[in-house]
């Protein structure tokens, strides 16, 4: 493996090998990360990286597109089948690019949007002032109820009536509960707004019925193709006939040039994998593992925002431990447990410190771990957070983590295991 790269650029080859070792020997609990299959990686590493294909299948600006046309059409058809929509655009390079395309298709600069507060679990592209969405549009925010930690739909409705937004965004990057897309569509209809559902984190759960679907409620749906969907890093837009032409034009030529055909091939492979019965079993296990991990963390005396989880992630409020999210992240890194610092609702700490950490189960579930392993992981996390400066203890836990991981190979190692 990597023999050509090692001969051409041994420095990069060595860094890739070291990253592979990190993934192999550590627990990946970042909620937005996962492991793609070898098939997806092979598609991404193929000769398709050499091909330009501006336009859509059958309507290209370049010759020689007969095979990439077939690949992209397969990706489109499989995405529509997977989510139950009539139209899909598989070209966005990322979830952020998908959101940019939707905003530029449906809005004019200065239009009003209503999105979820970033520190309440939303996403940068839903109106954060440091993002294009917060710079180009008049943004107002909704959030979670301080008592329950869950979306306050009554407050959302009141704000929508007051500001009459042109677009309401639903979806989040750090929200552990189910989203009521039907209620959000009712609110949108009441004020004449469009509803965009960003399901980047929960797409794999939505596709398998493990989370209510926004299809039939949202006018437009965006997502990434990695995370719980377990494909390559990229974006996807789902819609009906009403918005298809606008969205397609907004992706190209509006916000992008040539699509990444090697990534689109990887998306097609991942969508095909997600259509198989075993993927439904995988998605169900993600939620079971998340529930077990949340219960284990609670048993360790840790506080969870909203009290638990309904999906693939949980948010730990660290204020009772005296640690910031950044401190907890560093200590867990030393124990070979990877999480990310994350804001909690109304967080008093700045974004690079935070008062919380976000934890998710998609990657460890891909490795085959189940509820028993979640109980052990919770115990390790509890111990690290209790003794974050005990280097000997952290090294011991890292060794124990590596031993557990040895029994649950990442996809890149499965060929050797077989």
From Swiss-Prot:
MF (Gene Ontology): glycine hydroxymethyltransferase activity; pyridoxal phosphate binding
Residues that bind (6S)-5,6,7,8-tetrahydrofolate: 118, 122-124, 242
Role played: Catalyzes the reversible interconversion of serine and glycine with tetrahydrofolate (THF) serving as the one-carbon carrier. This reaction serves as the major source of one-carbon groups required for the biosynthesis of purines, thymidylate, methionine, and other important biomolecules. Also exhibits THF-independent aldolase activity toward beta-hydroxyamino acids, producing glycine and aldehydes, via a retro-aldol mechanism.
Organism ancestry: Bacteria, Bacillati, Chloroflexota, Chloroflexia, Chloroflexales
Cofactor: pyridoxal 5'-phosphate
Modification N6-(pyridoxal phosphate)lysine, positions: 227
Assembly: Homodimer.
GO cellular component, as recorded: cytosol
Protein name, UniProt field: Serine hydroxymethyltransferase
Gene of this entry: glyA
Family: Belongs to the SHMT family.
TM region(s), chain numbering: none
Entry EC number(s): 2.1.2.1
Pathway: One-carbon metabolism; tetrahydrofolate interconversion; Amino-acid biosynthesis; glycine biosynthesis; glycine from L-serine: step 1/1
